[in-house]
């Protein structure tokens, strides 16, 4: 059974979204369900800081021993930060998907777009 923390938002593409330190900025990662399906992550390709992203579009890739999967922007905005730790340790996506394995942060174009994402209960239904 995969972990689905309360207090986060979730996309249908298996990304989680959490409020980051700065107002109007969110942190994004892939869910425990997604990392489990991928298998051992060996490489992560992330968008560059400053890149404008649109919700639902591919912005990077996660490569595992099983496959290569797109990472989708769950919200629209500007990439504010990326997790450089993943360059040397991509397995953090597997071992700590909600902590050290986060992918990038986005400064939101509009905070109202968070309302269209799932809560933990909705995501649990989506993955069952």
UniProtKB/Swiss-Prot annotation:
- Requisite cofactors: (R)-lipoate
Name a biological process GO annotation. Answer: glycine decarboxylation via glycine cleavage system
Q: Which Pfam families match?
A: GCV_H
Asked if Signal is a keyword of the record, the answer is: no
What Gene3D superfamilies does this protein's entry cite?
A: 2.40.50.100
Q: Where is the Lipoyl-binding domain?
A: 25-107
**Keyword annotations:** Lipoyl
The family database entries (PROSITE patterns) matched by this protein are listed as: BIOTINYL_LIPOYL, LIPOYL
Q: Which SUPFAM superfamilies match?
A: Single hybrid motif (SSF51230)
Q: Does the keyword rRNA processing apply?
A: no
What's any one GO cellular component for it?
A: cytosol
Q: Which InterPro entries match?
A: 2-oxoA_DH_lipoyl-BS, Biotin_lipoyl, GCV_H, GCV_H/Fam206, GCV_H_sub, Single_hybrid_motif
N6-lipoyllysine occurs at which residues? 66
Origin, by domain of life? Bacteria
Q: How is the cofactor bound?
A: Binds 1 lipoyl cofactor covalently.
What is known about what this protein does?
The glycine cleavage system catalyzes the degradation of glycine. The H protein shuttles the methylamine group of glycine from the P protein to the T protein.
Give the UniProt family note.
Belongs to the GcvH family.
Q: Which PANTHER family match?
A: GLYCINE CLEAVAGE SYSTEM H PROTEIN, GLYCINE CLEAVAGE SYSTEM H PROTEIN-RELATED
Quaternary structure, per UniProt, is:
The glycine cleavage system is composed of four proteins: P, T, L and H.
Record-linked HAMAP family: GcvH (MF_00272)
Q: What is this protein called?
A: Glycine cleavage system H protein
Q: Which organism's genome codes for this protein?
A: Micrococcus luteus (strain ATCC 4698 / DSM 20030 / JCM 1464 / CCM 169 / CCUG 5858 / IAM 1056 / NBRC 3333 / NCIMB 9278 / NCTC 2665 / VKM Ac-2230) (Micrococcus lysodeikticus)
The gene it comes from is: gcvH
């Amino acid at each position: 059974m995969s972990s689905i923390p309360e207090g986060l938002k979730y996309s249908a593409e298996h990304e989680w979204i959490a409020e980051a330190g700065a107002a109007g900025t969110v942190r994004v990662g892939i869910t425990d369900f997604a990392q489990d399906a991928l298998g051992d992550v060996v490489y992560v390709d992330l968008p560059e800081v400053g890149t404008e992203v649109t919700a639902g579009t591919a912005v990077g890739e996660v490569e595992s021993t099983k496959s290569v999967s797109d990472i989708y922007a769950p919200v629209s905005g500007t990439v504010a930060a990326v997790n450089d730790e993943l360059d040397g340790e991509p397995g953090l996506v597997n071992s700590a998907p909600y902590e050290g394995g986060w992918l990038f942060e986005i400064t939101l174009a509009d905070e109202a777009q968070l309302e269209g994402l799932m809560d933990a209960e909705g995501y649990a239904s989506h993955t069952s």
